[in-house]
């Protein structure tokens, strides 16, 4: 099981040959840092009476990088548009393409976990890669693409097409609208690459342990009068055996990004195709009812349960346009579609005892997800006396339908986590597994916001609200018939934030925002006084207070205090309602930038006190929340060595505190520390810039358990080597 067929071996040899050619002649295993490429914003005429706090950024362009190119100087804040980090009353980090490339990230999860408040909540070689932000789960399916939901790859988001990965922490319903899955920990927004004024032709060959070979080509050009037209094309192929025993992967990605930037009209079109197959896919462990303690983490090189596959394909297209109606009024609109086709055989192992015995039941799953996402709005800048205004109106619509086929008539299996067994995947030949309707969701919203500036915009007050309608219907996937009542509820979420600039380089802020999740439906039981009743959307609430310090754009340091509460349903006095609540209260400190000549730091620390604040189950109130560590710490460092020009060495330490794996707090998972290391070397060969990169993840090959907020366990990533050569023609 898991061995490549002759056909796949032939394809891998072709990829390997191409990579070896790209790597030929590269004796060095190091690479130099690459300067981030920025794009000149299109000119926008601004009324003399309007005070502008930061330079305008054209459609699809990311704010200029700061902190030695590690992060962006701003981010897309939903209805508020691209906003400087110093003008934003929220905690936000925008990781640049330079950081993504130098870390040799393979997915958005690799990038996001550089943040001390973010951790993966699933294994990298799992079917999906989900995140935990401020202690709440955020699945890949809830990521935004250029500010719009429902358009990113459904299970795992690659990074080769991205200019930025933006993380806005906390619920953001008023800013972006409700996420498709109702996650509230934060918004991960993916900003696509655009053609720059300087031509780009870059080819990268890579090899990752055990023997995954890859090729990535990135080509961009601008043309026409004033370089108004742009095209950026990215293509990537990876194929081979991973560090996991008997596991193989094959990934293919293609994208075309077209854009036009005129004096008044700006538009863009992104076309993306992604395909990924994993053989011997890893799944997370569920906890058995008789488990009394968590066994020691097993080898990180074994697949669990040791069978199955995942084969998925995503196709998406996104068109956006904006037009300056006047010097102070801009209209914009966007439309996108995404289609997921997925076929998998997987089995979730159930951990039975401290000795490491587990059982599993296999299932063959097929799924399609069709998403249509629309946005439209207006932005206006003007003054009323001494007060400046940035007014924004937004309309969003997400229509998403999914079909599912699920067959589970396979014999169960048993094994032990220390045995490292590989099983044959049962044959699906002759089995009928038709697709039937599974879910339909329609999210419609209208929002209005105004940022008022006082004292020459030293004091900025943002007020806004969004009216969100949530419609949904679940279906019995066995026959496609509706299951339960149709959901149709609305809610209004406010937005309030204030920023005071003590100095141009020092901002103090406070904010209040809410998030939305679809309410639950009461069970149809005679013992319930309100059987079948659907609850209004759950409102998560966050209060935040923070300070930001920007030292000449060389270093950014932030400190934030926050309290985030999320309600849940339960039964109290025979009535089903909103009776539960989890409260995450904490503090974050993060920093990024050049602290000394040639020395750059990226990291921080977070403390979260996550408790069950309200509960209907006796004994749970006051317990620690599942899967949320008290302390998390990240520290990444780069040093441009003076003794070898062009050579940079780097390292990272990631620490995650102990967590509880069940609601009763009787099962706990030990803390873990991971150390990464690497180097890069930049030179020229025959006048052509060449960059070599070498990274090691989990340098000391520690075995550890990771936990998810749903109470699952997964085994951490084994020691992984990645080497690449990038040639810029």
Map each language-model feature to its residues:
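Outer-membrane beta-barrel translocator/receptor signature
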Residues: 160-163, 174-255, 260-266, 315, ...
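Acidic, small-polar-rich N-terminal luminal/periplasmic segments of exported/outer-membrane proteins
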Residues: 28, 47-198, 545
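Gram-negative outer-membrane beta-barrel transporters
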Residues: 560-565, 578-663
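Structural signature of Gram-negative outer-membrane beta-barrels, strongest in the C-terminal barrel
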Residues: 259, 369, 388-400, 437-566, ...
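Conserved C-terminal beta-signal and adjacent last beta-strands/turns
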Residues: 391, 510, 543, 626-729
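Outer-membrane beta-barrel proteins
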Residues: 206-213, 228, 236-261, 294-318, ...
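Face-selective signature of the C-terminal outer-membrane beta-barrel domain
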Residues: 318-340, 361-477
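Acidic/polar loop-and-plug regions of large Gram-negative outer-membrane beta-barrel proteins
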Residues: 238-242, 257-324, 337-369, 408-443
């Amino acid at each position: 099981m898991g061995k490549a067929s002759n056909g796949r071996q032939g394809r891998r040899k072709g990829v390997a040959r191409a990579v070896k050619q790209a790597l030929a002649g590269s004796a060095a295993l190091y690479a130099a840092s690459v300067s981030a490429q920025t794009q000149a914003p299109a000119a926008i005429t601004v009324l003399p009476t309007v005070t502008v706090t930061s330079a305008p950024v054209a459609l699809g362009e990311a704010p200029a990088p700061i902190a030695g190119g590690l992060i962006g100087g701003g981010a897309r804040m939903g209805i508020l548009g691209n906003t400087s980090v110093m003008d934003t009353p929220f905690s936000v980090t925008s990781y640049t393409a330079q950081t993504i490339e130098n870390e040799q990230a393979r997915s958005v999860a690799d990038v996001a976990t550089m943040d001390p408040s973010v951790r993966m909540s699933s294994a990298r070689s799992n079917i999906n890669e989900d995140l935990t932000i401020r202690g709440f789960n955020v699945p890949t399916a809830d990521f935004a693409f250029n500010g719009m939901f429902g358009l990113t790859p459904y299970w795992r988001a690659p990074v080769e097409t991205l200019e930025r990965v933006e993380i806005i922490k906390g619920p953001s319903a008023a800013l972006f609208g409700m996420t498709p899955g109702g996650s509230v920990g934060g918004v991960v927004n993916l900003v696509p690459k655009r053609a720059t004024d300087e031509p780009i032709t870059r080819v990268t060959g890579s090899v990752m342990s055990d023997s995954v070979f890859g090729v990535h080509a990135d080509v961009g050009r601008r043309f026409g009068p004033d370089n108004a037209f742009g095209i950026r094309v990215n293509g990537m192929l990876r194929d081979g055996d991973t560090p996991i025993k008997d596991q193989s992967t094959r990934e293919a990605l293609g994208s075309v990004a077209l854009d036009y930037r005129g004096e008044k009209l700006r538009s863009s079109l992104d076309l993306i195709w992604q395909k990924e197959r994993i053989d011997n896919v890893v799944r997370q462990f569920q906890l058995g009812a008789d488990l009394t303690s968590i066994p020691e983490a097993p080898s990180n090189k074994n697949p669990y349960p040791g069978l199955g596959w995942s084969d998925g394909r995503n196709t998406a297209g996104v068109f956006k346009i904006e037009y300056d109606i006047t010097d102070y009024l801009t209209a914009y609109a966007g439309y996108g579609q995404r289609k997921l086709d997925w076929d998998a055989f997987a089995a979730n192992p159930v951990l039975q005892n401290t000795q490491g015995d587990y059982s599993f039941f296999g299932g063959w799953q097929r799924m399609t997800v069709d998403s249509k996402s629309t946005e439209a709005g207006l932005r206006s800048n003007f003054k009323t006396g001494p007060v400046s205004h940035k007014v924004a109106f937004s309309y969003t619509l997400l229509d998403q339908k999914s079909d599912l086929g699920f067959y589970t008539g396979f014999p169960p299996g048993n094994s032990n986590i220390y045995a490292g067994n590989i099983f044959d995947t049962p044959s699906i030949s002759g089995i009928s597994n038709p697709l039937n309707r599974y879910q339909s969701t329609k999210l419609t919203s209208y929002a209005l916001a105004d940022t008022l500036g006082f004292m020459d915009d030293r004091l900025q007050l943002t007020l806004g609200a969004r009216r969100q309608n949530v419609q949904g219907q679940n279906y019995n996937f066995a026959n496609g018939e509706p299951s339960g009542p149709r959901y149709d509820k609305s809610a209004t979420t406010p937005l309030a934030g204030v920023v005071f600039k003590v100095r141009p380089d020092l901002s103090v802020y406070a904010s209040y925002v809410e998030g939305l999740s679809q309410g639950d439906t009461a069970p149809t039981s005679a013992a319930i006084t309100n059987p079948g009743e659907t609850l209004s959307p759950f409102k998560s609430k966050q209060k935040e207070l923070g300070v930001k310090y920007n030292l000449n754009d060389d270093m950014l340091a932030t400190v934030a205090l926050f309290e985030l509460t999320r309600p849940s349903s339960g039964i109290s006095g025979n009535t089903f309602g909103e009776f539960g609540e989890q409260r995450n209260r904490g503090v974050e400190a993060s920093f990024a930038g050049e602290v000394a000549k040639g020395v750059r730091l990226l990291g921080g620390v977070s403390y979260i006190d996550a408790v069950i604040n309200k509960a209907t189950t006796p004994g749970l109130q006051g317990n620690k929340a599942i899967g949320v560590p008290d302390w998390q710490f990240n520290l990444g460092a780069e040093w441009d060595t003076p003794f070898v020009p062009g050579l940079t060495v780097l390292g990272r330490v990631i620490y995650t505190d102990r967590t509880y794996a069940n609601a009763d707090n009787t099962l706990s998972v030990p803390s873990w520390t991971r150390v990464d290391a690497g180097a890069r070397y930049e030179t020229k060969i025959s006048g052509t810039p060449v960059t070599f990169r070498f990274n090691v993840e989990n340098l000391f090959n520690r075995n550890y358990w990771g936990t998810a907020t749903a109470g699952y366990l997964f085994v951490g990533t084994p020691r992984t080597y990645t080497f690449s050569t990038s040639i810029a023609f």
